[in-house]
A protein has these predicted regions:
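P-loop NTP-binding catalytic core
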Residues: 16, 33, 39-132
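Walker A (P-loop) phosphate-binding loop of P-loop NTPases
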Residues: 143
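Active-site phosphate-binding and catalytic loops of NTP-dependent enzymes
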Residues: 5-12, 58-77, 162, 254-260
């Protein structure tokens, strides 16, 4: 499916390397989210008829239904791989959609430091955490760069000889490892929880989940906590502590009892991202050290931007 089929304005936005997302609102206003300046209107107005045609065009290319009875379309644009979410009435006043572009390249941790997104000390700690096979959860709000950072961590994993199993419902992660398997959940066919359980029989060294958003949280925690360390996952949350609470909420979808000690044991590090575009920053890196009657025990002090990390051991460790 050619980008030009959506019209010259959208094609131009998708071709712009500074644009990360294109959004059409019910009032017909077309917006873009740029790396440097965030969300801004394009000044372009699109009719409801044209917007609906685009949504139906995408549906046709992915062999999906979309109509008043099934008004939400979630898809990947063929060939180019952008994430597309289209919505029709009656759930909105007029057709609307959002197109999220895939990353053009993998940002490394060195790139993050050069761009001021994280400090050298934070990057040093994360490299050590990957090398020591700690389980890392990347948390943040929408469009804060969780997947981009997960890709940077995957790039560090690629320097090992580990076998990596990557589980997603939308293809976004990129892995350079010579030995890796990508698996994808399909609505109505295979769930993320199914994939996590299947992964255990594929001899993984590390299990990576693009985004934890459902019952798979419990299966992932069990896998991480029982002989498969060194994984990565992303989750929507407003802080490092909030990421652990989010895991609790997801586990409760399938279990009455929340295994908080298991969460504390399985999740070793939480990286919290805040801001958007050029304003993205690693706001918090927390080491999960345990769980007691006071709740989760988190250590932050050693991973502040002002910390100067040793070269032979992780921040905060002494010989």
């Amino acid at each position: 499916m050619r980008r030009t089929a959506m019209g010259p304005e959208i094609a131009a936005a998708l071709a712009d390397p500074e644009v990360v997302e294109v959004m059409l609102n019910p009032d017909g206003a077309l917006w873009v989210d740029r790396l440097g300046s965030g969300r801004q209107p394009t000044g372009v107005s699109m009719s409801s008829a044209v917007a609906e045609r685009i949504i139906r065009l995408v549906a046709a290319h992915v062999n999906a239904e979309v109509h008043a009875g099934l008004p939400i379309l979630s898809a990947e644009l063929p060939e180019t791989g952008e994430r597309f979410l289209g919505v029709l009435p009656p759930v909105v006043r007029a057709p609307s959609f959002a197109i999220r572009k895939r990353a053009l390249r993998i940002m490394t941790l060195a790139d993050y430091v050069a761009d001021g997104v994280m400090s050298e000390a934070q990057a040093t700690f994360l490299r050590w955490a990957v090398r020591e096979r700690l389980n890392i959860v990347v948390a943040g709000g929408t469009s804060t760069g969780k997947t981009t950072l997960a890709n940077a961590l995957l790039d560090e994993i690629a320097q090992t000889r580990d076998r990596v199993l990557i589980l997603e419902d939308t293809v976004e992660l990129q892995c350079r490892s010579d030995d890796h398997v990508c698996m994808r959940a399909e609505p109505g066919i295979t769930t993320m929880a199914d994939l996590v359980r299947a992964t255990l029989r594929l001899r993984p060294d590390r299990i990576v989940v693009g985004e934890v958003r459902g019952a798979e949280a419990l299966d992932l925690l069990k896998a991480w906590g029982t002989g498969h360390p060194g994984g990565i996952a992303t989750v929507h949350a407003g802080s490092a502590a909030g990421a652990l609470t989010r895991f609790e909420q997801l586990v409760q979808e399938v279990s009455v009892t929340v295994p908080r000690p298991l969460i504390a044991e399985a999740v070793n590090v939480v990286v919290f991202l805040g801001g958007r575009g050029r304003g993205r920053r690693v706001r918090e890196i927390a080491r999960v050290t345990g769980f007691d009657t006071q709740g989760y025990q988190l250590s932050h002090d050693l991973y502040l931007p002002s910390f100067s990390a040793p070269t032979t051991q992780p921040p905060g460790e002494t010989p």
